[in-house]
């Protein structure tokens, strides 16, 4: 599955290039995190460069910057890029070019010098240039949350971006598509391929049309046919293993039918909320759900429409927490502490620095998804101990 998703990412990128060429755009902007690793593997670099070369052959300029995931990408460790591809350095810089129609365009941006940037780099962006027809900002970061423990990615204020009076802001970092402002288009297109269950739904880019005296035209474009999908439901009472089997099979078949109807492929998670006060049902979930799910994975392994990837069951209700022992209460407090990504990362420092992790596992694992999975499983264990008293 990992290899299939890697190929899906390349296919999605190539479709993006196809659309740019077919639409005869003036330029393509790639706002960081082109790679999942600090430097990018040679295979990843080759795929990127091949697409940029196609743009070059079509007479389309491309502008790229590196973000917090690929901050170590440097010229001497990277395959050569086409002449029409311009890379932003590690300080805020403005690059200019002229379109085929003769429009003068300025683009301001920067690449990350390190993984975390707590400084607001938007303060170094100049006001809109008066001598150009269009001024575009490229920025890899996120809105300031006013919390030093969370503001690690060049935190900015939306109001400040608006004050700079640019014609368009191409943002990177947030993997979900969202538009922060309409009057001045400030847009996260999201990533081009979901890689875990925090990145569900359609993925792609945006096609932006700017014309003086007119409102910008923003069009979302979908470029991937592999999507992550979460089937969420409240679990009914379970009276036997066959009930669990029927529940899983019915959910799976419904998703297969939908995938075929839409011409898509799903990576599927079954997510159920289980009533903790129903001790009989809870016992079946605890004792049989995982093994049964594994058997269904094997049964459906050759099914190409929907890959049955994951099962999560979450115990709902916490009415017995007041009956917890001091030890169990301390466990829950510790669990709350590790909701902070920085605290969670500190525990994993030795693992994350290990060469085998960085080489084989880091490209395939989302740390935020891993954190969520660990915390949910731990919470379930604590609640199970309470409900089984």
Regions found by a protein language model. Give the residues of each.
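A short, flexible beta-alpha/helix-coil linker loop
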Residues: 33-37, 142-144, 275-277
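Binuclear metal-dependent phosphoesterase catalytic core
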Residues: 93-100, 189-250
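Accessory, non-catalytic peripheral segments of nucleic-acid enzymes
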Residues: 224-389
